[in-house]
């Protein structure tokens, strides 16, 4: 029986918190069950609906996730980091299930060549690798991965709310998140849960730095060190 794997991510553009990459593996014969459950792109679902589907799809297939931390994103190209995460996820699935998937479907991002090389290193046949834009809305197995990634990211963000008082969705377009970040910087704090290479940090008066030019204003300078 063939295994199909879907891969998607959540939190790429977030200013606060992790980028979560998820892989969902299911037997080909059970793909129809995902459709029957109403699985679709997580962005089209309410938080409550995502959590409910997360529970239901847990009984249909196997999933695993990788979290990419803000300081990792600040230090390396985000697409390369995602490729490494996808490689680890698929490697874990192969190891756990003991078989190579007959098909791996990935929602397209900016390192397609690197992704294909990484998956072929794992023994995945090139013809078994499908990378498409909007795969999360076209393939239920990728939609399932999208739901897992979003639910896990939301849960991790909830932890940051309790630990740091983070407000809002974590995205730079969210006024609540921007106000929280502004307040943090006004207190002279620089928690590691923020992505300091995002231009929003500079706009909000924080210790922004450029990946290309190095630190424009170091954390030590910002904190008075």
Swiss-Prot record:
Primary location class: cytoplasm
Please give the cofactor(s) recorded in the UniProt entry for this protein: Mn(2+); Mg(2+)
Listed GO biological process terms: DNA replication, removal of RNA primer; mismatch repair
Q: Where in the cell is it found?
A: Cytoplasm
Residue span(s) of domain RNase H type-2: 2-210
Where is a divalent metal cation bound in this sequence? 8-9, 107
Alphabetized, the UniProt keywords read: Cytoplasm, Endonuclease, Hydrolase, Manganese, Metal-binding, Nuclease
| Catalytic reaction list | Endonucleolytic cleavage to 5'-phosphomonoester
CDD domains assigned to the protein according to its UniProt record, in alphabetical order: RNase_HII_archaea_like
Q: Name one GO cellular component term.
A: cytoplasm
**Top-level taxon of origin:** Archaea
Q: What is its EC number?
A: 3.1.26.4
PROSITE patterns on file: RNASE_H_2
**Molecular function in Gene Ontology:** manganese ion binding; RNA binding; RNA-DNA hybrid ribonuclease activity
Query: Which protein is depicted?
Result: Ribonuclease HII
- State the organism of origin: Aeropyrum pernix (strain ATCC 700893 / DSM 11879 / JCM 9820 / NBRC 100138 / K1)
Kindly list the organism's lineage.
Archaea, Thermoproteota, Thermoprotei, Desulfurococcales, Desulfurococcaceae
């Amino acid at each position: 029986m063939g295994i199909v794997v879907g891969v998607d991510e959540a939190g790429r553009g977030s200013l606060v918190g992790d980028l979560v990459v998820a892989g969902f593996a299911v037997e080909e014969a059970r793909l129809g069950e995902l459709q029957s459950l109403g699985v679709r792109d997580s962005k089209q679902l309410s938080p409550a609906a995502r959590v409910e589907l997360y529970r239901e799809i847990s009984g249909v297939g196997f999933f695993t996730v990788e979290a990419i931390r803000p300081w990792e994103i600040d230090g390396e190209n985000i697409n390369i980091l995602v490729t490494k995460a996808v490689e680890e996820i698929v490697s874990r699935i192969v190891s756990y299930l003991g078989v190579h998937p007959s098909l791996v479907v990935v929602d397209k991002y900016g390192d397609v060549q690197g992704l294909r090389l990484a998956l072929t290193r794992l023994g995945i046949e090139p013809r078994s690798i499908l990378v498409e834009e909007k795969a999360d809305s076209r393939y239920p197995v990728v939609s399932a991965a999208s739901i897992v990634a979003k639910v896990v990211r939301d849960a991790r963000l909830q932890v940051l709310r309790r630990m740091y008082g983070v407000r809002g969705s974590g995205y730079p377009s969210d006024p609540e998140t921007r106000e929280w970040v502004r307040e943090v910087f006004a207190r002279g704090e620089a928690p590691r849960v923020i992505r300091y290479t995002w231009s929003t940090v500079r706009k909000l008066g924080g210790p922004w730095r450029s990946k290309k030019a190095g630190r424009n204003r170091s954390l030590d300078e910002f904190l008075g060190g």
